[in-house]
Amino acid sequence: MKFVATLIACGLSGLALAAPTATVDSLEKRGPNDAAFGYASLNGGTTGGAGGTTTTVSSYAAFTAAVSSDAKKVVYVSGPIKQSAKQVKVGSNTSIIGKDSTAVLEGFGLLVKEKSNVIIRNLGVKKVLAENGDAIGIQYSNNVWVDHVDVSSDRDHDKDYYDGLIDLTHAADYVTISNCYIHDHWKASLVGHSDNNGDEDTGHLRVTYANNYWSNINSRAPSLRFGTGHVYNSYFENVSDGINTRDGAQVLVESNQFVGSSKALYSTDAGYAVEKDNDFGGAKNTALKGTLTTVPYSYSLVGSSKVKSAVVGQAGQTLKF
């Protein structure tokens, strides 16, 4: 949507909610039936198409047909698929899994709208023109896990040539974005699309960003309105405007490292944050002090001094199925 604005665990768990330890848990899962962690683990959990039919696709036509229904299904993507087209609508109870690093969607993105229980994993999505929508858009939907994806465009064009990479809008809820490589883009990840949408969004937009590598981003890394965010174990490299909390959002920011940022963590229109063990790399935390000190799920922290080695080279489309 367009608006003016293998080391880390896929299932990091088992630690006390109030006092996660600064250790690395190497528990990365690689099976098609893995369940999500973070906010996507709540509200009944996110299992995607586990237990359903399995198919492998390698063409645009086969892909669009395979992901559309709400029946349980696991759809493997084999090789690159290139098509200039609007976002492909994804049905509920779906797992979309790239078989390896060649599984890249180019020119079109994915839309999860009014759906639930969706997993998008080990997939590349790149160079989706603004007229075709976001690379990954999540609207009016709950329980979505985006894991080990590589999303990008370029910064050779102006900021409106492409739209968002991963955008959550219209009361999307219980979402986890983990182990992703998010790079080479102007406006990366928007949570809450408008200052005027508080009536719909307040009480929703709960999202976890964990173990991600953000690189060469101008802004929205991420930008959160109204919702509740948890950003941890992530490495931010040459991200001009980083985490922007706004319009009453509450964000817990832990165990991250920033290099080359001008605004690492900041508020707009009364957004709030609590930060713990972050290396802002010379930039400042100017966010208003928040109240979100714990989250209702287990997780572990690697520590800001270890984030780069833990995330770079591991985040992104690095799995094989």
UniProtKB/Swiss-Prot annotation:
<keyword id="KW-0732">Signal</keyword>
<feature type="binding site">
    <location>
        <position position="167"/>
    </location>
    <ligand>
        <name>Ca(2+)</name>
    </ligand>
</feature>
<feature type="binding site">
    <location>
        <position position="163"/>
    </location>
    <ligand>
        <name>Ca(2+)</name>
    </ligand>
</feature>
<dbReference type="InterPro" id="IPR011050">
    <property type="entry name" value="Pectin_lyase_fold/virulence"/>
</dbReference>
<keyword id="KW-0106">Calcium</keyword>
<feature type="signal peptide">
    <location>
        <begin position="1"/>
        <end position="18"/>
    </location>
</feature>
<dbReference type="InterPro" id="IPR045032">
    <property type="entry name" value="PEL"/>
</dbReference>
<dbReference type="GO" id="GO:0005576">
    <property type="term" value="C:extracellular region"/>
</dbReference>
<keyword id="KW-0964">Secreted</keyword>
<dbReference type="GO" id="GO:0046872">
    <property type="term" value="F:metal ion binding"/>
</dbReference>
<protein>
    <recommendedName>
        <fullName>Probable pectate lyase A</fullName>
        <ecNumber>4.2.2.2</ecNumber>
    </recommendedName>
</protein>
<dbReference type="GO" id="GO:0030570">
    <property type="term" value="F:pectate lyase activity"/>
</dbReference>
<feature type="active site">
    <location>
        <position position="220"/>
    </location>
</feature>
<comment type="function">
    <text>Pectinolytic enzyme consist of four classes of enzymes: pectin lyase, polygalacturonase, pectin methylesterase and rhamnogalacturonase. Among pectinolytic enzymes, pectin lyase is the most important in depolymerization of pectin, since it cleaves internal glycosidic bonds of highly methylated pectins. Favors pectate, the anion, over pectin, the methyl ester.</text>
</comment>
<keyword id="KW-0119">Carbohydrate metabolism</keyword>
<dbReference type="Pfam" id="PF00544">
    <property type="entry name" value="Pectate_lyase_4"/>
</dbReference>
<feature type="binding site">
    <location>
        <position position="134"/>
    </location>
    <ligand>
        <name>Ca(2+)</name>
    </ligand>
</feature>
<keyword id="KW-0456">Lyase</keyword>
<keyword id="KW-0961">Cell wall biogenesis/degradation</keyword>
<feature type="glycosylation site" description="N-linked (GlcNAc...) asparagine">
    <location>
        <position position="93"/>
    </location>
</feature>
<feature type="glycosylation site" description="N-linked (GlcNAc...) asparagine">
    <location>
        <position position="238"/>
    </location>
</feature>
<dbReference type="GO" id="GO:0071555">
    <property type="term" value="P:cell wall organization"/>
</dbReference>
<comment type="similarity">
    <text>Belongs to the polysaccharide lyase 1 family.</text>
</comment>
<dbReference type="InterPro" id="IPR012334">
    <property type="entry name" value="Pectin_lyas_fold"/>
</dbReference>
<dbReference type="GO" id="GO:0045490">
    <property type="term" value="P:pectin catabolic process"/>
</dbReference>
<keyword id="KW-0325">Glycoprotein</keyword>
<dbReference type="InterPro" id="IPR002022">
    <property type="entry name" value="Pec_lyase"/>
</dbReference>
<keyword id="KW-0624">Polysaccharide degradation</keyword>
<keyword id="KW-0479">Metal-binding</keyword>
